[in-house]
Amino acid sequence: QHYSFNRYADIDGITRVYISKTLLKAIIKSENPAMKISGNKVNLNNKELLSKMDGILVLTGTNTRIANMMHEDATKLSHTKEYEHILYRNEKELAIDVFTRESKGVILEIILIDKTDQNNRIIQLMGQFTPDDILSMIKI
């Protein structure tokens, strides 16, 4: 079971976008299946990668209080056994945390927390991934 961000479904000050597996299949069939999320920081730039996804959820906090609340909630993942904190980078041009949940050597969920600007974003990718998939998505 993936981490639920449902508490943010109806909160004022949060933009919530979900892309289903069905829509991802349509994107794969298009001539240019590239998707960029959170500016140019997360690139989902090939059919093979998109075909591994079961869904994408993007939450953007549109004010500082909400953005901080989202960030605090998401970083609680590092205190659980199910999630591993695999990447932390904090520079002016890129400030991200990446968490993964895996089972039997397969990464089932990737959660990226983008703190680069005042509008924190949480990007949740569900599917079946490899470590190389993560490296292809994120500019490190």
Task: Label each PLM-derived region with a short phrase.
Residues F129-I140:
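Surface-exposed amphipathic alpha-helical segments
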